């Protein structure tokens, strides 16, 4: 069962009894409890109490595939049919690298709500909170030598920071070489 469905059935700042939530989601209470505690572990703000049930402490902002597709209609670089939106995946990067048609690799994007094995720089594991981060990978093939893309991570970071600063306002910074920071937290990381 997608966890998104479970969260959509859970009210914001209002208790729902576990039995009622289990019925809404067609889950037994043990499975429901397991899913809720996994969501809490992954950073979703859920209140829980044995006698009162559960509630969302704040609204959850889901990735809207339809909205992304509409936005991509105007894009000359990425076509909507090359976009894949998943609730959960091991790694968006791995997903793209294992795409069956390598000839169709260029210009493909994978967006997810959660990665179980996200990758950071130097092969380090990267973990983002479920439903709080934009986790995506974009496949782009270069016709030039790989040594010409040395500064690409920094260039992409600057471009992303420039766009995000329109919404974020003051306080947005680029931390060498590939992290975009805001209010003392990491807003984005660029991995090339």
Q: What are these model-derived regions, one by one?
A:
Residues 2-166, 188:
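N-terminal lobe of the biotin/lipoate ligase/transferase fold
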Residues 174-182, 186, 191:
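Glycine- and Gly-Pro-enriched alpha-helical subdomains that act as flexible
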């Amino acid at each position: 069962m997608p966890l998104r469905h479970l969260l959509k059935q859970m009210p914001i700042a209002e208790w729902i009894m576990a039995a009622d939530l289990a019925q809404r989601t067609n889950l037994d209470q043990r499975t429901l409890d397991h899913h809720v505690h996994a969501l809490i572990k992954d950073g979703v703000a859920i209140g829980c109490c044995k006698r009162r049930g559960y509630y969302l402490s704040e609204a959850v902002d889901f990735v809207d595939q339809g909205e992304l597709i509409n936005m991509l209609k105007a894009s000359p670089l990425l076509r909507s049919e090359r976009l894949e939106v998943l609730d959960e995946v091991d790694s968006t990067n791995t997903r793209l690298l294992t795409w069956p048609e390598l000839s169709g690799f260029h210009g493909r994007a994978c967006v997810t709500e959660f990665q179980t094995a996200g990758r950071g720089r130097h092969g380090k594991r990267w973990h983002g909170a479920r439903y709080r981060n934009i986790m995506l990978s974009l496949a782009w093939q270069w016709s030039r030598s790989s040594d010409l893309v040395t500064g690409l991570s920094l260039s992409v970071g600057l471009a992303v920071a420039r766009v995000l600063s329109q919404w974020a306002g003051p306080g947005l910074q680029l931390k060498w070489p590939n992290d975009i920071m805001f209010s003392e937290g990491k807003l984005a990381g660029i991995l090339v």
